[in-house]
Amino acid sequence: MSDLDERLRRRAQKGILRPELRVGVVSFVKSYVAHINLRDAGNPSGTHFEGGRYGKGEVGEFILVEGQRSILLGRIMEVRLPDGERQIIGQDYAGSNELDAIGHIQLLGSISMVDFHFTAGVDLYPRLGDRVYAAPHQLIALIPYLMIRTGDGDTPVQLELGAVGDANESKVSITPEKLFGRHCAILGATGGGKSWTTARIIEECIKHKGKIILLDATGEYGEFS
């Protein structure tokens, strides 16, 4: 059994829909968009679970919607209050469980309840009242693997590029075919980690004895051999 299969087995044993990470319920559904009522958005901070921090309603957080036949993966793109309740948050606001916040979700893909295989797009749209959970960091880290996993025991070469959050076992790996199969560009602001990311990719390719043609005008990567 490969390391990725072992990580998936442990995650499956623990479950991917954890009651400790429940975020809210679906209140509105549209093509590739859903709104959820956030039950913990009024709390002054998030929560820690299995070594990682979860906002439970913060912008950018990945979430799971418990559907009838599959689990939907989404991401919180916006959090707001109804216009009539905005005055609740004043200069002395210290948190409240009664805050009626709404999260706007972009639906990204579907996860099979049988083998956790991930496919882009929505197989079946959620229903009003479906429960929503923060996605465990370990599951998000396995998404690239779940898109190509065949179940025949043959694990392809994986380039380890980083990690999701600060949880254990949340390292993200991707196959060279997925990374280099089409145009690949590393973009970001100054100090955003472009050079580090490039160096990481080169290191991983060298580790797996990959062949690279490197045009290094500034000599930044001259120490690689």
Where are these regions (language model features)?
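Glycine-rich phosphate-binding loop of nucleotide-binding enzymes
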Residues: 156-225
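Conserved ASCE P-loop ATPase motor domains encompassing nucleic-acid-directed helicases/translocases
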Residues: 2-153
